[in-house]
C-alpha cells in the first residue's frame, strides 16, 4: 500500500534505525492540544464545529441566568464576522488565583483546560457547557478574542490571539450599575476554512433555543451582516411561558386534536430537579417532533428523561381509559399515543450523566422514575379536569392504534402467503414474527459466525442467514455466474423482494438487512462485496433505508474483572488511555479473530442487542452515478481502483501527516 503514496518506483529494502529517546516525547502545554487536535474538543473543524463555539460561550452566559445571577443576554454579529456575547451576571472573577498567584482567575480560566467553577455545586447548582473545557477552547481557536468584565465600578479587559495573551489585564473606571461579562471573538481561519463565516440564521436559532429553555431570560439579538428575510436584524427574544410559548410558535394551533397544550413547570428542592414540558396532539403526523434538553444541552438521542415522560403519558391514558370503562385502550402502545404528538422537554439536574462526549443522550440513574412520577401526576389532573377533552384525545389515539393493527394484519396475510410459496434456504434461522415490521436479517459468513449469531439473536424479531461459499463480486461477474451463485441465491430467496426491475418492496420479508462481518480487513472486504450486490441488484432497497452494517468489536479489554470493547485500533488506544488514567490496575487486551470466536452473550451485548449496539445505515448520496462508482471500485479494471486510491491519497496526505504523533 505504501507504494501508492510514492512516485518513486525504486523499492528500498534497507531499514534505517534511528535513536528513540526522551527528547522524542512531545509534551503539549496550555492550549496547544486544542489547536493541534481541535476535533477532540469541538467535534471537528467544519461549520457545525465553528458554531459550537457560539453555543459554548452562550452556555456560560445561560449558566449565570439559570443560577439566578443574570436576566439579560446580548448577542451581536458584527460586520467583520466577529460575534459578541454579553450577560449581566456577576462577571468572571479577576482577583489572583490561589493556585497561580501571579495570574488572575480570568487568565487562568481563559488559558487552562478544565478550569472553572462548574466542577462543584458551590457556584453553579446545574450547568451545561462542553466537556468541562469551556471558554478556554473558544480562546484557543479564535484569531481575535477580547474579554471585558464589569465588576464593582470597574471595567477589566484583556486581549488574546490563538490562546496566547496579547495584553495584561487592564483596569478602567466604569459605572457601578454595570456588571457582567462581554466576549468578542473571531474564529481562527487557520483552524476553520477562510470561507467559513457565522450563519445569522443558525446563530438566531441557537439564541431562540436558549431563550425558551429558561423563561426568565431575555436575549437581545442584533446582526450587522445581511440576514435572510425570515430573520430579524434586531429582536428581543423572550418566552415568558417557556416551552409552551415555543411549542405554540412551532405548530398550527388550528390543527390540534384538543385545543389545550399539556404543559408544566416544576422545581423541586427535595429532588434537586427542575422540569418543564409542553405536549400537543395534531390531526396528522407530518409535523410531529420531539425535542429534549438537559441543563440546556440538546439530547437528540433522548435518554432517561424521555423514557420517564413516555411512561407517564402511557400510564396516564391507560388509567383514564380504565376509569371510564373503555377497554379498547388496553393494548395501546407509546408509539400509538405519540404518533401525532409534538413534545418539548427540558430538565435541570445536578451532575447529569451523558452517553458519549457529545452529550446527545442522558443516562442519569433515577431520572426516569422521577420524571415519570411528576408528569404522571400532572397528566392525571389534566385529563380529569376536562373529561370531554380527555375522551376525545383517547379516541384519537385508539383510532391510530386500530389503524396500525389493521395494517399489520394486512402485512401478515401478505407475508404468510409469500412465505408459504418459498422454499427458504436451509441455513436460514428465521424469526417467528410473521410481519416484516420490526424484524431484522443478519447476514453472516460461515457456520461458525452463524452459530454464535443464532444463539445470540432474539428469536421473535431477528433472523440469521449464514452464507455458503464465496461471496461473489457481482460488479465483475457475468449474469450466468450471478444467477448460479449459491450465496446470492440464498440471499435473494430469503429476502423475497426480487431484484432489479422485479424488486417489490411490499414483498421484503424484513425491515432491516444487517451485514455482520468480522471487524478486521477480511470482514470489511466481505462487507464490500455484499454492499456491491445490494447497490447493483437491489438499489431501491438501499434507497428505502433497509440496509445496515453492524459494528462488532475487534478488541476486548479487561481491567479489575470489568470488560470493555473497542471496534478498532483507534478506539482501543483511547479506551486504554482512559482506563489507565482512572486506575492503575493492569489492563489485559485480547483480539477477536472473528465473530465465531465470540461467545453468544458477548455478540448479543456488543453487536445484536438493539439498545446496546451501534449500526451504520447505508445510504446512496449519488443515485445517478452509483453504477459508475461501483464499477470503478469493484469492477474488472484494477487501474481505476489504483487511480481512485492514488487521488484520495494525495488529497488526504496532509491530514494523515498531521494526525501522526512522532
From Swiss-Prot:
GO biological process: one example: chromosome segregation
Positions that bind Mg(2+) 2: 518, 520
Binding site for Mg(2+) 1: 445, 518
Binding site for ATP: 20, 60, 87, 129-135, 359
Domain Toprim: residue ranges: 439-553
UniProt keyword annotations, A-Z: ATP-binding, DNA-binding, Isomerase, Magnesium, Metal-binding, Nucleotide-binding, Topoisomerase
Name of the protein this chain belongs to: DNA topoisomerase 4 subunit B
Source organism of the structure: Rickettsia prowazekii (strain Madrid E)
Taxonomic lineage from the root: Bacteria, Pseudomonadati, Pseudomonadota, Alphaproteobacteria, Rickettsiales
Amino acid at each position: 500500500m505504501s507504494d501508492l503514496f510514492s512516485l518513486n518506483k525504486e523499492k528500498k529494502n534497507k531499514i534505517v534505525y534511528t535513536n528513540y529517546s526522551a527528547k522524542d516525547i512531545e509534551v503539549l502545554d496550555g492550549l496547544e492540544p486544542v489547536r493541534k487536535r481541535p476535533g477532540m474538543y469541538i467535534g471537528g473543524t467544519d461549520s457545525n464545529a465553528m458554531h459550537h463555539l457560539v453555543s459554548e460561550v452562550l452556555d456560560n452566559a445561560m449558566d449565570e441566568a439559570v443560577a439566578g445571577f443574570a436576566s439579560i443576554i446580548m448577542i451581536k454579529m458584527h460586520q467583520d464576522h466577529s460575534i459578541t456575547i454579553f450577560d449581566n451576571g456577576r462577571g468572571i472573577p479577576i482577583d489572583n488565583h490561589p493556585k497561580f498567584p501571579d495570574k488572575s482567575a480570568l487568565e487562568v480560566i481563559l488559558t487552562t483546560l478544565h478550569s472553572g467553577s462548574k466542577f462543584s455545586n458551590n457556584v453553579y447548582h446545574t450547568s451545561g457547557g462542553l466537556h468541562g473545557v469551556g471558554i478556554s477552547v473558544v480562546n484557543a481557536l479564535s484569531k481575535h478574542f477580547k474579554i471585558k468584565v464589569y465588576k464593582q465600578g470597574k471595567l477589566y479587559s484583556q486581549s488574546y490571539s490563538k490562546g496566547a495573551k496579547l495584553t495584561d489585564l487592564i483596569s478602567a473606571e466604569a459605572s457601578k450599575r454595570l456588571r457582567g461579562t462581554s466576549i468578542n471573538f473571531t474564529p481562527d481561519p487557520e483552524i476553520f476554512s477562510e470561507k467559513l463565516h457565522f450563519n445569522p440564521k443558525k446563530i438566531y436559532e441557537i439564541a431562540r433555543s436558549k431563550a425558551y429553555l429558561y423563561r426568565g431570560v431575555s436575549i437581545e439579538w442584533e446582526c450587522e451582516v445581511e440576514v435572510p428575510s425570515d430573520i430579524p436584524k434586531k429582536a428581543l427574544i423572550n418566552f415568558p411561558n417557556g416551552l409552551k410559548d415555543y411549542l405554540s410558535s412551532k405548530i398550527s394551533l388550528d390543527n390540534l386534536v384538543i385545543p389545550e397544550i399539556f404543559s408544566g413547570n416544576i422545581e423541586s428542592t427535595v429532588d434537586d430537579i427542575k422540569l418543564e414540558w409542553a405536549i400537543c396532539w395534531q390531526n396528522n403526523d407530518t409535523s410531529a417532533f420531539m425535542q429534549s434538553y438537559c441543563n440546556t444541552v440538546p439530547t437528540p438521542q433522548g435518554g432517561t428523561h424521555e423514557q420517564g415522560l413516555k411512561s407517564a403519558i402511557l400510564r396516564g391514558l391507560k388509567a383514564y381509559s380504565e376509569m371510564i370503562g373503555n377497554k379498547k385502550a388496553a393494548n395501546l402502545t407509546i408509539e400509538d399515543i405519540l404518533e401525532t404528538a409534538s413534545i418539548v422537554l427540558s430538565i435541570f439536574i445536578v451532575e447529569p450523566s451523558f452517553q458519549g462526549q457529545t452529550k446527545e443522550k442522558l443516562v442519569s440513574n433515577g431520572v426516569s422514575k422521577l420524571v415519570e412520577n411528576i408528569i404522571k401526576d400532572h397528566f392525571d389532573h389534566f385529563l380529569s379536569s376536562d373529561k370531554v377533552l380527555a375522551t376525545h384525545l383517547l379516541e384519537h389515539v385508539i383510532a391510530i392504534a386500530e389503524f396500525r393493527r389493521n395494517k399489520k394484519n394486512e402485512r401478515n396475510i401478505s407475508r404468510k402467503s409469500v412465505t408459504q410459496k418459498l422454499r427458504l434456504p436451509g441455513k436460514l434461522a428465521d424469526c417467528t414474527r410473521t410481519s416484516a415490521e420490526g424484524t431484522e436479517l443478519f447476514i453472516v459468513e460461515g457456520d461458525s459466525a452463524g452459530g454464535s449469531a443464532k444463539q445470540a439473536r432474539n428469536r421473535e424479531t431477528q433472523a440469521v442467514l449464514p452464507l455458503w461459499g464465496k461471496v461473489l463480486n457481482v460488479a465483475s461477474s457475468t449474469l450466468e455466474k450471478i444467477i448460479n451463485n449459491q450465496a446470492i441465491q440464498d440471499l435473494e430467496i430469503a429476502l423475497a423482494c426480487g431484484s432489479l426491475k422485479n424488486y417489490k418492496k411490499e414483498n421484503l420479508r424484513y425491515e432491516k438487512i444487517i451485514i455482520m462481518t468480522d471487524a478486521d480487513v477480511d470482514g470489511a472486504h466481505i462487507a464490500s462485496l455484499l454492499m456491491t450486490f445490494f447497490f447493483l441488484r437491489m438499489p431501491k432497497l438501499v434507497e428505502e433505508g433497509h440496509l445496515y452494517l453492524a459494528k462488532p468489536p475487534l478488541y476486548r479489554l479487561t481491567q479489575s474483572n470489568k470488560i470493555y470493547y473497542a471496534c478498532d485500533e483507534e478506539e482501543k488506544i483511547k479506551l486504554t488511555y482512559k482506563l489507565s488514567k482512572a486506575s492503575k490496575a493492569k489492563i489485559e487486551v485480547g483480539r477477536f479473530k472473528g465473530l465465531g470466536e465470540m461467545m453468544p452473550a458477548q455478540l448479543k451485548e456488543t453487536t445484536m442487542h438493539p439498545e446496546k449496539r451501534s449500526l451504520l445505515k447505508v445510504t446512496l448520496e449519488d443515485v445517478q452515478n452509483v453504477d459508475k462508482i461501483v464499477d470503478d471500485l469493484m469492477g474488472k479494471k484494477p487501474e481505476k481502483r489504483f487511480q481512485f486510491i492514488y487521488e484520495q491519497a494525495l488529497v488526504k496526505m496532509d491530514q494523515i501527516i498531521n494526525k501522526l504523533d512522532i
